Each structure stands twice: as C-alpha cells, then as structure tokens.
Amino acid sequence: MTKTQKAEIIEVLSNEFKDAQSVIFCDYKGLSVSKLENLRKMARAKDTKVQVVKNTLATIALSNASLTGVELKDTNILVWGADSVATSKVCADFAKDNEKFVIKSAYVDREAADAAKVEAFAKLPGREELLAMLAATWMAPVTCFTIGLDALRQKKEEA
C-alpha cells in the first residue's frame, strides 16, 4: 500500500469517525468470509459501517477525529455509525450468533468504553421504539378520557 493510498484511507476514515457517535472494535479471528458478509448486511440495514483497517491507520484516523483513549492490538474489525444504540445492537446480535466474534472496546457517544458498556447500549430500545413509547404516553390521557366519555354515553342511552 502506497503512502497516498494510506493518506486517502486515513482522510476518509477521519471524516467518517467525526460523524460517528460510536466506533466499536471487535476481534474476528476464525470467522469465515460469508459470516463477515452477514455482519456487513446486518450493519447496512441499520446504517452502520463495517471495515477491517490496519491498527496504525485506524489510530491515526481516530486521533484526527478527536477520539483517544483506546489502544488497538491484534486484529480488529471496526463497526461505526451515527446511532450508538443501533451500532451496539449490530455488534451484540452478531456476537450472540458467532462466538468467535468478540467485542473488545469502543467509543460510545464519543467516549472510551469497554465491552460491557456496548452490551448495555445494545439492550436499550432503539429510536423508533422510544418514539412509539413516547407517543403512547402522550396518548394515554386522551384515550382514557375517550373511554370514559363512551362509557358515560352508553350509560345515558341505557337509562
């Protein structure tokens, strides 16, 4: 790989990491190409990106994006996205099905985190689920009021 190619990769990754709310580092030793392709498909469905990058290039790109505090060792596959919960869910769900896929560390909400924090974020409801819960909470008083009015109407009709 030439210096210009490395510089291009660093520039692209730096821009990607600046926009990302979470970057997760995972070990993928022993996984087949087809399983990694399944990970990429899962990630694409959640607007999350997956890439294997050399540790030195990733470290430079992360520092350019003001993300420091995590040391990269051994082989790593990087998973990143704008939604911390969705990115964490992609990694956690894939790790459940593939024991060789191990979450090592991460930046979650742009702060250094361990695998336990990634697992905790994966258990949170997603954005759509939270919006549905909020709408249901807002609609509860109106729904109860409507049910009460309907019961009152039925009672008056019977009398």
From Swiss-Prot:
InterPro entries membership: Ribosomal_uL10 (IPR001790), Ribosomal_uL10-like_sf (IPR043141), Ribosomal_uL10_bac (IPR022973), Ribosomal_uL10_bac_type (IPR047865), Ribosomal_uL10_CS_bac (IPR002363)
GO MF annotation list: large ribosomal subunit rRNA binding; structural constituent of ribosome
Pfam families linked to this entry: Ribosomal_L10
GO term, biological process aspect, one: translation
KW Protease (keyword) present: no
Annotated Gene Ontology cellular component terms: large ribosomal subunit
Domain of life per record: Bacteria
Record keywords: Ribonucleoprotein, Ribosomal protein, RNA-binding, rRNA-binding
Alphabetical list of HAMAP family matching this protein: Ribosomal_uL10
Its biological purpose: Forms part of the ribosomal stalk, playing a central role in the interaction of the ribosome with GTP-bound translation factors.
SUBUNIT field: Part of the ribosomal stalk of the 50S ribosomal subunit. The N-terminus interacts with L11 and the large rRNA to form the base of the stalk. The C-terminus forms an elongated spine to which L12 dimers bind in a sequential fashion forming a multimeric L10(L12)X complex.
Family assignment from sequence similarity: Belongs to the universal ribosomal protein uL10 family.
NCBIfam families on file: PRK00099.1-1
Name of the protein: Large ribosomal subunit protein uL10
Organism: Sulfurimonas denitrificans (strain ATCC 33889 / DSM 1251) (Thiomicrospira denitrificans (strain ATCC 33889 / DSM 1251))
